[in-house]
Amino acid sequence: FWGNLRAKEEIIMKAVVQRVSHAHVDIDGVTVGAIEKGFLVLLGVWSGDSEGDCRQLAEKVGNLRVFEDENGKLNKALADVQGAVLVVPNFTIAGDCRKGNRPSFIKAERPERAVPLFELFKQTLAERGIPVQSGVFGADMQVSLVNDGPITLIVEKGDNSF
């Protein structure tokens, strides 16, 4: 019980979302995921994250209105523009650089818990009808993208957010 308590306003799960005109992820020179218009999402899973946190973050990302409407306002979501998502697992997002020059990754979730949450994030987006591609958890990946805008957002699921 006590291990699940979190400090007030503590960040739980985080996604770095970049609006892209296209993006792909390669492993050993082979493309394993690619999209055209949509989002490249670098997903960080924190120790103690829950399925509920994951679903809420995926819903938030899927509903982001950062595509231009006919008046040039950022008013359209992925579904409105037939966009896709390329999700790349990235434990380094949980890195803490406050002390010293070497990041601490102690807050990153262990792979045996993080992988199912990564898969749930993708599944939640797909259930909304959003095409999803992904990188591979634990792999050494090369990610290429053209950031459109540029628009880059950090979407965080904390105890008191959304």
Where are these regions (language model features)?
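Short, Lys/Arg-enriched N-terminal segments with co-localized hydrophobic residues
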Residues: 1-12
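Flexible glycine-/small-residue-rich
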Residues: 19, 45, 89-90, 145-147, ...
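Compact, glycine-rich, soluble single-domain proteins
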Residues: 30-82, 92-123, 133
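Residue-level signal for inorganic ion chemistry
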Residues: 57, 88, 151
